[in-house]
Amino acid sequence: MIRTILQQYRSESAFNRDLGDRFERLIRAYLKLDPQYVALFSDVWMWKDWPEREAYGYKAPDTGIDLVAKLRDDEGFCAIQCKFYDTPIPLGDLGNFFTLSGKGGFTQRLIVATANLSNNAADALENQTIPVEMMTLEDLESSPIDWSQFSIEKPDQLRKLPKKDPREHQSEALADVLKGFKSSDRGKLIMACGTGKTYTSLIVAQEMVKLGQTILFLVPSIALLSQTLRAWTADASMPLRCFAVCSDSKASRNEEDMRIYELAYPATTNAIKLAKSIAETQDNTAVTVVFSTYQSIEVVHQAQQKTGIEFDLV
């Protein structure tokens, strides 16, 4: 459905500037509604409307940054560039974005693109001093936004899909798990493919932890981490404060797995940063969830050693 919306934008926009403006406004509305980004950003502005733009010395009306988001649990901002392209995006078309967002005030970067990156551009996103994430058309398609309800006349009024309700077999699995934990402190839930293991893990977690407690969720790949993070934030009935821990090194990443920037969510392999972030944000208003790949579990362990953080559910 999102592809149909974008095609309508193309057919109705006489100029590339108009097309870009429409796409930017759509992405701003999306970031302010998708639970994954609502938990990450406290506000999102068009570049020209960013209230602190001049305070940070940025005066140009539009030289590479399209949107600015305030990081909810951080003093910094995220610079966002929206690329409405049909063909692979060359590195040269990202130059102004990298330069401008590196001058001050920004601690994260996000590129939202409707096309793939060229090989050189993709390589440039890795190992940046200011981390870069990339959101794709597929991310928008799989988001919890009900694109069928989108109105071209009211692009700021997006709607979310309703949250899932447990199916009978998932409710039975939940009951079995809770029963098992009455007599044991660990267990194994085995479910067939396609039966909703990720969602079942969420409803189990929601029954076992309360606000202010902490969960560690381990996965074998960056791709599965991305899928789980999106699924949990979309259907959770309690506020979640999420952290992603994963490595993009060739030694720890399967060739078929995603690159770390494709997670479209800030990730870290720095134990000190992880420990500091958890310690500074943990309170009784949300459940803290650390999503980590198996390969990066040592980072989580080091963070625990530095702060004494204990997980209530693993």
Where are these regions (language model features)?
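Catalytic centers of nucleases
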Residues: 19-104, 122-123
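Extracellular/luminal Protease-associated
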Residues: 98, 108-112
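SF2 helicase/translocase NTPase motor core
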Residues: 1-18, 41-58, 102, 114-314
